[in-house]
Amino acid sequence: MAHGNAPRDSYHLVGISFFILGLGTLLPWNFFITAIPYFQGRLAGTNSSAETPSTNHTSPTDTFNFNNWVTLLSQLPLLLFTLLNSFLYQCIPESVRILGSLLAILLLFALTAALVKVDLSPGLFFSITMASVWFINSFCAVLQGSLFGQLGTMPSTYSTLFLSGQGLAGIFAALAMLTSLASGVDPQTSALGYFITPCVGILLSIICYLSLPHLKFARYYLTKKPQAPVQELETKAELLGADEKNGIPVSPQQAGPTLDLDPEKELELGLEEPQKPGKPSVFVVFRKIWLTALCLVLVFTVTLSVFPAITAMVTTSSNSPGKWSQFFNPICCFLLFNVMDWLGRSLTSYFLWPDEDSQLLPLLVCLRFLFVPLFMLCHVPQRARLPIIFWQDAYFITFMLLFAISNGYFVSLTMCLAPRQVLPHEREVAGALMTFFLALGLSCGASLSFLFKALL
């Protein structure tokens, strides 16, 4: 069918729905890591969210290694379900996967909010929280993969809106934390309000998903979905690797350069090329993109090895106990990272440098390892071995700015270059491989964070 026969997206309701769904897929991860001060305050034995980044890192609560565990248990499900996607998608209907995941995430986040009012021992609170983190992020992995499958049937604009929603999830969480801190209410009420916020976001996501079958525009495209459930994984791969000109942002902190995935154009091309090539070999495709895939792994390994495990421990060097000490980490760590990461991913919509034939990319990616010692030598009061060299706040802010924008740019660049290194009929496999290596890099970085934390 031609696009001219498609109904209009009245009031952009479908676009808004997919934007909110994108936001909902990454709200859990971002709200957990942004609330590290609250969790460390609870693990110190106090039911308070008043613990600020400037106070909680000097307490013995870091014996739980909360920062490290929340990162690892958030990323391992992504790696696991990347491997299980094909089997899972064939066994469970799409609507059950999406709606069931959203409801499970809502209930688990409601539990997290309820625990604000419940006095628990630090050990029990840690165990319950880690279990919630694992299951919430497992459902998020299923949800994200399933929604990518739906987006494969929609015009590319809706892929962009979905990814833009993901990109703003981290910024939204940081702003929610700042609002909570600035509210002036008691710490417990502030924490309760903070954790209710993502519950509202997930509830809106459920409403948006349930509304899609009632919107003519959504029905027009979603009914063209292939019958075989396994196609959802393939569509996800195509979404990741279809555009040769724009960046493809996929990570715990996403954003939205333009994607060029048009199902109508694909149908037209299919009619023009009746003789399709044989199924591409995974090994052959891997040989073509292995260096780009390695770069993607290294980018996320560096990022997750210090963010948020080390960066969330950095405090202001100011001796005054004023507002700046309370707002320093939420602003300079989480808000700055998410804004600059989003900016870095967006840059690939305008230029791609270095290109796929350049050997400069691996060198630039490896240079990011310098951020590990730089952050470890910043003002982290709780340390036993390394000295503090970069005392001033300006050092940390500068490092974070470069760290975040380089993460966003190189992630988007590698996801963009991979499909350019293979033949058109191999891009699907290339996208699937890059998805796996993305998850591998996240898990490797989360695992390394334990080592770097121990070296402080």
Swiss-Prot record:
Residues recorded as bearing Phosphoserine in the entry: 251
Signal peptide extent: none
SUPFAM superfamilies registered for this protein in UniProt: MFS general substrate transporter
A Pfam short name: Nucleoside_tran
InterPro entries recorded: ENT1/ENT2, Eqnu_transpt, MFS_trans_sf
Primary localization: membrane
Tissue expr: Expressed in squeletal muscles. Expressed in testis at the blood-brain-barrier.
Subcellular location(s) of the protein: Apical cell membrane; Basolateral cell membrane
GO CC, any one term: apical plasma membrane
Biological processes, Gene Ontology terms: adenine transport; adenosine transport; cellular response to insulin stimulus; cytidine transport; guanine transmembrane transport; guanine transport; hypoxanthine transport; inosine transport
Membrane topology reported for the UniProt record: Multi-pass membrane protein
Key words of the record: Cell membrane, Glycoprotein, Membrane, Phosphoprotein, Transmembrane, Transmembrane helix, Transport
UniProt-recorded Gene Ontology molecular function terms: adenine transmembrane transporter activity; cytidine transmembrane transporter activity; guanine transmembrane transporter activity; neurotransmitter transmembrane transporter activity; nucleobase transmembrane transporter activity; nucleoside transmembrane transporter activity; purine nucleoside transmembrane transporter activity; uracil transmembrane transporter activity
Regions crossing the membrane: 13-29, 69-93, 98-116, 125-143, 161-185, 193-213, 292-311, 324-342, 360-378, 394-413, 432-452
Physiological role: Bidirectional uniporter involved in the facilitative transport of nucleosides and nucleobases, and contributes to maintaining their cellular homeostasis. Functions as a Na(+)-independent, passive transporter. Involved in the transport of nucleosides such as inosine, adenosine, uridine, thymidine, cytidine and guanosine. Also able to transport purine nucleobases (hypoxanthine, adenine, guanine) and pyrimidine nucleobases (thymine, uracil). Involved in nucleoside transport at basolateral membrane of kidney cells, allowing liver absorption of nucleoside metabolites.
More details: Transport activity is insensitive to nanomolar concentrations of the inhibitor nitrobenzylmercaptopurine riboside (NBMPR). Inhibited by higher concentrations of NBMPR (1uM-10uM).
Name used for this protein in its record: Equilibrative nucleoside transporter 2
Organism: Rattus norvegicus (Rat)
